[in-house]
């Protein structure tokens, strides 16, 4: 059986960042490391503009990914969140 993948695109507000932003980032990295250790987060990519990230989850539903994203320390700074299921092209 093929693993299911879900893509999450997170964009945060970068104007008026809180004073403890570096602390929030540190906690965010800890959460991401735990997700990778639990093996349901396959990869995280930072956006070139540094205003968000792209996360690739595996073996979770869209709903589960949405719930996980709400637990991120950066979530309160969220400007937008897109969660998209991915379908592998098995012909290639």
Residue ranges, per PLM feature:
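Conserved, structured core segments of small domains
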Residues: 1-92
């Amino acid at each position: 059986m093929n693993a299911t993948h879900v893509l999450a695109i997170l964009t945060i507000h970068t104007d008026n960042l809180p004073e403890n932003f570096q602390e929030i980032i540190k906690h965010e990295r800890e959460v991401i490391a735990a997700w990778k250790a639990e093996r349901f987060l396959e990869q995280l990519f930072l956006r070139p503009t540094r205003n968000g990230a792209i996360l690739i989850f595996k073996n979770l539903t869209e709903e589960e990914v949405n719930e996980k994203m709400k637990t991120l320390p950066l979530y309160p700074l969220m400007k937008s969140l897109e969660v998209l299921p991915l379908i592998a092209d098995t012909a290639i």
